[in-house]
C-alpha cells in the first residue's frame, strides 16, 4: 500500500528559549576536549568533530543515525559550562527584568490591583488580536520606579547595566557587581504567573534560561572544515570559537576544583563570558572582536544571519536559481522591442523541456541528430520506465556524439527532451536592482552570434515663483544654492507634509524649448510655467498647456513671509555654558557635546532648525511648560493628539524623542476676584521630553521656566531681531495654543474677534513686557492688537491675578500672514477664512465698480466651505485667463517624497526607460521558464508590449531615444530617391507598393519622408500636437508653421510637422501613447518596431555624425567670450579691493565676508550666462549637436554652451571653494588670494580644455554630487526593502478588493477608485479633451 504525506497547514509559530534540560535532551554527545582530529586524521570522540554530531568526510558513517555524507542532517552536542554566563542577545532584556522584579522574593514589583488590571488588558488584547508588548512595556516602566516591594516589603535596590554584559546593584552610594550566578539566582525566583506580566511564556521561555549553564554545539554539517591544497585541514570560524570556549571552560573547571584564588577564577570567568559573547556576536559594541591569526575577524552566529551576506537577505530573500544566465548587454536596433538577442553559447547551455507528440516528433528527431554541440540541438532525453521494483521511474540520458543517432531513431511520443533555447522561446529578462515591475519582463529569443545579450533601445516655472517651505516662502531661483538644505511643503492626497528635495534645475527657457504661459485665477493669483508643467485641478493632473479658462485649480491660500538670508548666530557654546552656570548645573561637557552632535550649536537663523525652535519656543511660552533643575528637568507639551504628533516630528528633526502621549482628566476649584468659587472639569493630552540638553537650550533661547504667571518676561531678543519668517513661526505657534478658533458671526459673513488672555499676579502686572512685545511684533505684519484689562482669580497661594485680554481685528492679515501652528483644525479654518476674505474683498470691489444693487447678498462662510474648499486648507479657484509669455530662465525641483508636487505661488503643482540600462558594461540576467504554465503566464502578463505604458502615470515609459529620434527628424524633414525610399520601407517591414513621386527635382523623382513614416502609423489615427522643435512663437500659426513644428496626423497619415521626442520618445511620446490607448499594445509595439528601424535607416542614408568640431566657435565669438570673462575678473578685483579697504556695502543680514562672497558669486554667474548666450548665438541649426538638443534626442543647449564657452564657478555646499591648505585652496596661488580663479572659477570650456588647477576645482565640485547620490541610493534601497517586507502579501482579489494573505480586507476597491493607473490617461480615468479632438478631426473641424 502506498503512503501519502498528509499536507499540514501551519497555524502559528511560537518562539521560545532552549532550556538547559532541552539542550541536554537534544544533544547526542557531551563535548569535553578542544581537540578535533587524532594523528591519523580521524575525528576524536568528545571533540568538536565527534562523528556522533554528523559526518562531512566520504567514507565515514554517523554514529547517531548511521547516515553517510549527504544523508545525515547532523546532530547537536553540548558543553557543560563551569560557571553560568549571560547570553549577550538577552543582556538588555535581563536588565529590564532585574529592574522590574524584587531581588528578594522574585515577584514583579506592582500591586495586586494593578496586576489584575494588566492581566485583564492582556486577555482583551489576546482576544481582539492586539499587541500585548505595549502593556508589558507599561509593566516594566511602572515596576522599575518602585523602591519597596509591595509583596514582601523588602527594599528593592536599583540596577545599573554596563554594556555588554555587566550588572551592578546600587545600594546607597555603593555599587556591587552581580555575577551571572547572582543574576540567574534572582531570575529563578520569578514565579510562572509573573513571567506573563513580563511578556514571557514560562512554558517555553523562563527568564533564567537567558543565563547559560549549558551551551549547545551545532552539528558538524553547519560548520564543515575544508582541506587545503597542502593537505592541511582548515576549520570553520564557529569551530575555532568553540575550541576557545572549551579550552577556557576546562581551565576554569580545573581551577575551581583545585581551590584557586577568587581573582584567577573571576579572570577566567570573564574570559569565558568574552568567548561566549563573541561566539554569538563578534560585532557587539564594547567588545574587541575575536580574530584569526591573520587578523581577519571571525564570522560567528550573528554575522551569519544579518546584513547583505546573511541568511535572510542572501539565502532566503535572494535566491540562486537554475536555468538562468548573465552576461554583458549591448544594443541592437534591428530587434523588436519584444525580442532579446541571446548568444549561441548560452542558447546551447540553457534548455527548454518539450514533450514529444505526433505533431513535433519529426522536428525533435532533427534536433536530436544535431546533438548537444550543434545549435539547435538536444542536451537530455527523459523517459519514464517501469523499474525493477515495479514502480514508474524517470531516466535521464545525456545526448552525446555517440548516442545522438540512436535516440533520433528511437525517440517516442511521451518522452521529454531538454532542447536548446531557440528563436521565439519565451524568456524572462531582468536588470538589477529590480525596483519596479518593468525591471523584469518577458521577451522572445533571437539566437545570435558573439557573447552579449542584445536588446532594442527602445518639466518648469519662472524664477520669481515662490515655493512654500515650512511656514515661509522663497523664490525658486533663490533655491539654487540652498535646495539641499531645505524642506518644501508637499501634498499627499491633500494632506500637507514636508519633504526634502532630490534635484534642482535651472534651464535657459529658449533652450528648454517649451511654450511658456501666464495663468491667472479669479482672485488675481498668477503663475508663469512651461506648457509641460503639471497642475493639480479638480479633474486630476493637467499639463499647463492643457489647462483652459474655467478649469478649477487647487490652491493653498497664504501670504506667509519670504525667506531672508541671515547667517547671524542665535546661540553658541558660550551662551549654553552661561545658562548651565546660572542654574548651578553639572555635566556641562556632556550637554554641550549632545547639542553639538545634534548640530544645535552654533545655531544660525539660516538653519532649518532655527524655524523649528522658534515654533517650539512659541508653544512653550503658550500652553507648554519648562521645568529646569539639577535632578528632574523636562519640557511639557500640551494640545490635541494630532498636534502633539506634529510637535514630536519637529522634535525628531532636532534629534529628540518625546515620551508617550498621555490623557489627563480632572477637576479644579477656582476662586474669582470676589471670592466666588467654581469647579472646572476638563481633560487634555500632553507628553514630556526629559532631556536636560533640550531644557538648557530652550532656557538659552529665552523660554521661561516654572510658573509663568508670577514671572516678568518679554519675547526673547533673538526672536524680536529675527527675520520676519522666524517671527511668524514663533507667533503662529504661540497663537496655536492661546488664540481662539476662527468663528463666524450669526449673519454668516464676518468673523468674531480673535482673542487671547495673559494672566499675571498683581505685583508685576504693570511691568510685564510680553503683551507689549507681541503688540509691536504684530504691527510688522500689518495687524493691530487691542488690549483691555480684567480682574482675574484668587490663587491657592494667596496671590491675586489680573488678566490682559487682547483682541485681533485684522482678520485677513492674520489668517494670511501668520495663522496657527501645532493646531491643525484652527490652521485649516484659517486657510479657508483667508480665501473667503479675499473673495469677499473682490466681491465688494466689483460691486463698487459695477454699481451692483446693495441687496445682492454675499455667500455665507459655511456655504463657501461646501462649494469652494477641499480639505486640510486646500481650496479651488477658477482660471480666468491664460496668456503666452516669455522669460529668460525656467526652474524646477524634484521632491524625495513620492508625492512629487510642491506649492508654487499658492498653486499645487507637480514636479517637472524601464530597464534604465546603458551599454558601458552593464550586465543583465535571463531566466528560462520550465513549464507551459510559466511560459503562458509570462507571455500573457509580462511581454514588453504590455508594459509600454507606465503603471505610475499611464504615459509611455518605453519609447524612442537618441539616434531613433534624430533619425525620425531627418526622415520626416527630407525627401528620398526611389531606391532610398524602398530601402527605408523594407527596413521597417513594410511591403506596400510605392506611390507616385511627391516631387521631381533635376529629373529625379523624390518621395516624401512624411509619407514614408506614415506607413508605420495605423489607419484611423487622428492627432494634433506641437513638436519639441517648436520655437514658441508669440502667435501659433498651427498648420502654417514655417518651422514645420505643428504635427497633424489624419487617418493615419502625417500631413504636417516633423517627428521628434514629443512624437514617440519615452514618457513624452504622444503618437505612441495614443496608439497604445486606442489600438492596443500590439499595435504600439508594431509602430515602435517599424518606426525605429526606418529612422535608423534614414540616419544611415543621410549620415549623422557629431564630433568635437561641432563645438567650434569662430574667432570673433571667442574674443567676445574672453572680453566678458576679463571684465568679470576685473569686477571681482574691485569688490576685493573695496572689501580690504572696508568700503564694501553690506547686504541685508550678511556680514562683511558673506557680502563679499555674495557680490563675487553674482558677478561670476552673470559672466558664465553671458558667455553661454554668445556661444548659443553662433551655433546654428545645421549643427548635428544642436539637432540632437532641440529634437530631444540627447542633452540640451546648456550642455553645448558649457562645452564651447565657459564652465563657470565650481561650488561645494553652495559656496565658492575655500577648503584646502591654510590661507589658500591650492599651493599654486598666493596666501590670502581671494580672486575668482583661486577659489574655483573655471573660465575654460570643455572644448578648450581645463588647466590643472581648474581640473582640480572641477573634480571637487563633482565629488559632492557623487557622494550625495550614493547616500540617497542607500537610503532609498533600505526604504524599499522595508516596504516590500511589509506589503509583500497584499493582492487584488477578483472582486476588486485588496486583501492580505490572511484574507483581511485592506481596501474595498483597489486605490479606492478601482482604476489601474497604467490604463488611466496620465492620471485621468477618461480624457474628454482627446475624445472631442477626435470627433473634430473626423469631421474636418
Curated annotation (Swiss-Prot):
Entry GO CC: cytoplasm; DNA-directed RNA polymerase complex
Domain of life of the source: Archaea
One protein family per Pfam: Intein_splicing
SMART domains (UniProt xref): HintC, HintN, RPOLA_N
Co-factor note (free text): Binds at least 2 Zn(2+) per subunit.
Entry-linked SUPFAM superfamilies: beta and beta-prime subunits of DNA dependent RNA-polymerase, Hedgehog/intein (Hint) domain, Homing endonucleases
Enzyme Commission number, as recorded: 2.7.7.6
Chain sites annotated for binding Mg(2+): 918, 920, 922
Entry GO MF terms: DNA binding; DNA-directed RNA polymerase activity; endonuclease activity; magnesium ion binding; zinc ion binding
Localization per record: Cytoplasm
InterPro entries: DNA-dir_RpoC_beta_prime (IPR045867), Hint_dom_C (IPR003586), Hint_dom_N (IPR003587), Hint_dom_sf (IPR036844), Homing_endonucl (IPR027434), INTEIN (IPR006142), Intein_C (IPR030934), Intein_endonuc_central (IPR004042)
Broad class of where this protein is predominantly found: cytoplasm
Cofactor(s) it depends on: Mg(2+); Zn(2+)
Major enzyme class: transferase
Keyword vocabulary terms for this entry: Autocatalytic cleavage, Cytoplasm, DNA-binding, DNA-directed RNA polymerase, Magnesium, Metal-binding, Nucleotidyltransferase, Protein splicing, Transcription, Transferase, Zinc
Any one of the GO BP annotations: intein-mediated protein splicing
Catalytic reactions on record: RNA(n) + a ribonucleoside 5'-triphosphate = RNA(n+1) + diphosphate
Amino-acid positions noted as binding Zn(2+) 1 in the UniProt annotation, renumbered to this chain: 62, 65, 72, 75
Cross-referenced HAMAP family: RNApol_arch_Rpo1N
Binding partners and assembly: Part of the RNA polymerase complex.
Function summary: DNA-dependent RNA polymerase (RNAP) catalyzes the transcription of DNA into RNA using the four ribonucleoside triphosphates as substrates. Forms the clamp head domain.
Family: Belongs to the RNA polymerase beta' chain family.
Name assigned to this protein: DNA-directed RNA polymerase subunit Rpo1N
Gene responsible for this protein: rpo1N
Amino acid at each position: 500500500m502506498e503512503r501519502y504525506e498528509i499536507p499540514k497547514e501551519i497555524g502559528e509559530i511560537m518562539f521560545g528559549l532552549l532550556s538547559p534540560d532541552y539542550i541536554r535532551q537534544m544533544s547526542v554527545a557531551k563535548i569535553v576536549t578542544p581537540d578535533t582530529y587524532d594523528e591519523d586524521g580521524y575525528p576524536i570522540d568528545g571533540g568538536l568533530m565527534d562523528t556522533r554530531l554528523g559526518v562531512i568526510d566520504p567514507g565515514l558513517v554517523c554514529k547517531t543515525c548511521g547516515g553517510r555524507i549527504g544523508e545525515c542532517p547532523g546532530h547537536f552536542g553540548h558543553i557543560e559550562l563551569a560557571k553560568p554566563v549571560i547570553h549577550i542577545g538577552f543582556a538588555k532584556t535581563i536588565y529590564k527584568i532585574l529592574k522590574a522584579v524584587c531581588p528578594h522574593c522574585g515577584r514583579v514589583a506592582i500591586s495586586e490591583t494593578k496586576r489584575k488590571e494588566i492581566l485583564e488588558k492582556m486577555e482583551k488584547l489576546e482576544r481582539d488580536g492586539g499587541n500585548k508588548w505595549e502593556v508589558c512595556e507599561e509593566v516594566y516602566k511602572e515596576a522599575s520606579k518602585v523602591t519597596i516591594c509591595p509583596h514582601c516589603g523588602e527594599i528593592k535596590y536599583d540596577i545599573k547595566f554596563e554594556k555588554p554584559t555587566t550588572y551592578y546593584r546600587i545600594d546607597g552610594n555603593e555599587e556591587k557587581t552581580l555575577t551571572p550566578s547572582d543574576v540567574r539566582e534572582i531570575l529563578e525566583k520569578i514565579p510562572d504567573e509573573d513571567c506573563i506580566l513580563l511578556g514571557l511564556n514560562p512554558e517555553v521561555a523562563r527568564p533564567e534560561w537567558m543565563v547559560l549553564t549549558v551551551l549547545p554545539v551545532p552539528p558538524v554539517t553547519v560548520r564543515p572544515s575544508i582541506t587545503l591544497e597542502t593537505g592541511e585541514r582548515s576549520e570553520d570560524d564557529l569551530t575555532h570559537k568553540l575550541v576557545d570556549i572549551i579550552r577556557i571552560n576546562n581551565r576554569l573547571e580545573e581551577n575551581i576544583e583545585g581551590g584557586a584564588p577568587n581573582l584567577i577564577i573571576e579572570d577566567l570567568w570573564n574570559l569565558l563570558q568574552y568567548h561566549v559573547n563573541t561566539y554569538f556576536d563578534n560585532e557587539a559594541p564594547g567588545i574587541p572582536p575575536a580574530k584569526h591569526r591573520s587578523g581577519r575577524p571571525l564570522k560567528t552566529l550573528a554575522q551569519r544571519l544579518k546584513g547583505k551576506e546573511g541568511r535572510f537577505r542572501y539565502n532566503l530573500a535572494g535566491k540562486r536559481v537554475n536555468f538562468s544566465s548573465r552576461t554583458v548587454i549591448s544594443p541592437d536596433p534591428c530587434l523588436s522591442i519584444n525580442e532579446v538577442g541571446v548568444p549561441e553559447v548560452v542558447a546551447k547551455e540553457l534548455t527548454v523541456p518539450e514533450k514529444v507528440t505526433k505533431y513535433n516528433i519529426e522536428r525533435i528527431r532533427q534536433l536530436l541528430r544535431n546533438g548537444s554541440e550543434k545549435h539547435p540541438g538536444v542536451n537530455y532525453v527523459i523517459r519514464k520506465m517501469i523499474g525493477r521494483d515495479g514502480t514508474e521511474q524517470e531516466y535521464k540520458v545525456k545526448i552525446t556524439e555517440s548516442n545522438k543517432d540512436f535516440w533520433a531513431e528511437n525517440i517516442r511520443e511521451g518522452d521529454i527532451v531538454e532542447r536548446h533555447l531557440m528563436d521565439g522561446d519565451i524568456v524572462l529578462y531582468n536588470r538589477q536592482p529590480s525596483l519596479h515591475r518593468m525591471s523584469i519582463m518577458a521577451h522572445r529569443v533571437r539566437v545570435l552570434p558573439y557573447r552579449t545579450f542584445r536588446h532594442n533601445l527602445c518639466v518648469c516655472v519662472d524664477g520669481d515663483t515662490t515655493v512654500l517651505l515650512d511656514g515661509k516662502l522663497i523664490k525658486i531661483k533663490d533655491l539654487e544654492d540652498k535646495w539641499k538644505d531645505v524642506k518644501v511643503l508637499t501634498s499627499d492626497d491633500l494632506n500637507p507634509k514636508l519633504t526634502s528635495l532630490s534635484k534642482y534645475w535651472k534651464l535657459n527657457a529658449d533652450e528648454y524649448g517649451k511654450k511658456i504661459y501666464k495663468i491667472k485665477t479669479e482672485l488675481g493669483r498668477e503663475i508663469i510655467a512651461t506648457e509641460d508643467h503639471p497642475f493639480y485641478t479638480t479633474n486630476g493632473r493637467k499639463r499647463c498647456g492643457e489647462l483652459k479658462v474655467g478649469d478649477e485649480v487647487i490652491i493653498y491660500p497664504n501670504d506667509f513671509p519670504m525667506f531672508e538670508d541671515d547667517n547671524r548666530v542665535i546661540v553658541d557654546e558660550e551662551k549654553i555654558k552661561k545658562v548651565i552656570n546660572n542654574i548651578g548645573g553639572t555635566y556641562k561637557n556632556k550637554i554641550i557635546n549632545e547639542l553639538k552632535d545634534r548640530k544645535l550649536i552654533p545655531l544660525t537663523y539660516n538653519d532649518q532648525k532655527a524655524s523649528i525652535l522658534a515654533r517650539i519656543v512659541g508653544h512653550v511660552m503658550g500652553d507648554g511648560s519648562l521645568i529646569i533643575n539639577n535632578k528632574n528637568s523636562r519640557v511639557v507639551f500640551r494640545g490635541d493628539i494630532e498636534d502633539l504628533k506634529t510637535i514630536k516630528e519637529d522634535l525628531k528633526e532636532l534629534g529628540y524623542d518625546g515620551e508617550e502621549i498621555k490623557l489627563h482628566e480632572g477637576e479644579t476649584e477656582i476662586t474669582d476676584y470676589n471670592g466666588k468659587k467654581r469647579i472646572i472639569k476638563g481633560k487634555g493630552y500632553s507628553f514630556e521630553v526629559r532631556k536636560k540638553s533640550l531644557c538648557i537650550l530652550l532656557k538659552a533661547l529665552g523660554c521661561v521656566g516654572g510658573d509663568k504667571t508670577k514671572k516678568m518676561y518679554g519675547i526673547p531678543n533673538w526672536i524680536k531681531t529675527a527675520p520676519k519668517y522666524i517671527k511668524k513661526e514663533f507667533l503662529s505657534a504661540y497663537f496655536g495654543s492661546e488664540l481662539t478658533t476662527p468663528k463666524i458671526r450669526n449673519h454668516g459673513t464676518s468673523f468674531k474677534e480673535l482673542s487671547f488672555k495673559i494672566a499675571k499676579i498683581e505685583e508685576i502686572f504693570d511691568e510685564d513686557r510680553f503683551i507689549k512685545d507681541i503688540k509691536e511684533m504684530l504691527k510688522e505684519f500689518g495687524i493691530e492688537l487691542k488690549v483691555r484689562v480684567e480682574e482675574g482669580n484668587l490663587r491657592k497661594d494667596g496671590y491675586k491675578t489680573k488678566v490682559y485680554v487682547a483682541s485681533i481685528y485684522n482678520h485677513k492679515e492674520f489668517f494670511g500672514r501668520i495663522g496657527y501652528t501645532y493646531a491643525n483644525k484652527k490652521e485649516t479654518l484659517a486657510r479657508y477664512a483667508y480665501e473667503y476674505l479675499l473673495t469677499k474683498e473682490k466681491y465688494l470691489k466689483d460691486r463698487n465698480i459695477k454699481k451692483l444693487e446693495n441687496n445682492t447678498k454675499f455667500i455665507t462662510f459655511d456655504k463657501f466651505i461646501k462649494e469652494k474648499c477641499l480639505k486640510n486648507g486646500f481650496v479651488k479657484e477658477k482660471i480666468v485667463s491664460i496668456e503666452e509669455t516669455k522669460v529668460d530662465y525656467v526652474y524646477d525641483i524634484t521632491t524625495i517624497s513620492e508625492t512629487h508636487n510642491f506649492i508654487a505661488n499658492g498653486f499645487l503643482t507637480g514636479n517637472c526607460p524601464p530597464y534604465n540600462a546603458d551599454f558601458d558594461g552593464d550586465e543583465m540576467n535571463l531566466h528560462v521558464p520550465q513549464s507551459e504554465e510559466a511560459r503562458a503566464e509570462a507571455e500573457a502578463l509580462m511581454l514588453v508590449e504590455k508594459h509600454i505604458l507606465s503603471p505610475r502615470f499611464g504615459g509611455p515609459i518605453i519609447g524612442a531615444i537618441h539616434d531613433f529620434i534624430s533619425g525620425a527628424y531627418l526622415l520626416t524633414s527630407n525627401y528620398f530617391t526611389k531606391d532610398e525610399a524602398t530601402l527605408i520601407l523594407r527596413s521597417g517591414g513594410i511591403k506596400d507598393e510605392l506611390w507616385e513621386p511627391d516631387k521631381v527635382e533635376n529629373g529625379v523623382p523624390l518621395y516624401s519622408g512624411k509619407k514614408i513614416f506614415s506607413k508605420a502609423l495605423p489607419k484611423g489615427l487622428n492627432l494634433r500636437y506641437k513638436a519639441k522643435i517648436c520655437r514658441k512663437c508669440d502667435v501659433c500659426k498651427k498648420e502654417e508653421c514655417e518651422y514645420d513644428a505643428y504635427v497633424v496626423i489624419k487617418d493615419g497619415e502625417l500631413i504636417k510637422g516633423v517627428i521628434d521626442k514629443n512624437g514617440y520618445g519615452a514618457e513624452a511620446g504622444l503618437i505612441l501613447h495614443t496608439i497604445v490607448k486606442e489600438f492596443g499594445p500590439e499595435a504600439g509595439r508594431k509602430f515602435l518596431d517599424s518606426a525605429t528601424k526606418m529612422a535608423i535607416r534614414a540616419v544611415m542614408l543621410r549620415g549623422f555624425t557629431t564630433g568635437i568640431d561641432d563645438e567650434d566657435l569662430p574667432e570673433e565669438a571667442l574674443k567676445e567670450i574672453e572680453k566678458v570673462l576679463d571684465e568679470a575678473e576685473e569686477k571681482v578685483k574691485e569688490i576685493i579691493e573695496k572689501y580690504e579697504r572696508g568700503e564694501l556695502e553690506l547686504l541685508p543680514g550678511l556680514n562683511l565676508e558673506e557680502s563679499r562672497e555674495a557680490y563675487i558669486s553674482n558677478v561670476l554667474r552673470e559672466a558664465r550666462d553671458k558667455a553661454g548666450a554668445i556661444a548659443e548665438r553662433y551655433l546654428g541649426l545645421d549643427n548635428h549637436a544642436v539637432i540632437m538638443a532641440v529634437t530631444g534626442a540627447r542633452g540640451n543647449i546648456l550642455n553645448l554652451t558649457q562645452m564651447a564657452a565657459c564652465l563657470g564657478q565650481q561650488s561645494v555646499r553652495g559656496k565658492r571653494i575655500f577648503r584646502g591648505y591654510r590661507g589658500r585652496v591650492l599651493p599654486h596661488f598666493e596666501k590670502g588670494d581671494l580672486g575668482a580663479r583661486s577659489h574655483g572659477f573655471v573660465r575654460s570650456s570643455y572644448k578648450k580644455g581645463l588647466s590643472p588647477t581648474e581640473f582640480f576645482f572641477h573634480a571637487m565640485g563633482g565629488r559632492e554630487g557623487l557622494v550625495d547620490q550614493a547616500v540617497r541610493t542607500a537610503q532609498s534601497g533600505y526604504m524599499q526593502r522595508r516596504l516590500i517586507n511589509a506589503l509583500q502579501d497584499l493582492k487584488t482579489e477578483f472582486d476588486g478588493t485588496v486583501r492580505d494573505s490572511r484574507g483581511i480586507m485592506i481596501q474595498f476597491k483597489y486605490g479606492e477608485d478601482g482604476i489601474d493607473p497604467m490604463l488611466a490617461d496620465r492620471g485621468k480615468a477618461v480624457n474628454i479633451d482627446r475624445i472631442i479632438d477626435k470627433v473634430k478631426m473626423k469631421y474636418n473641424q
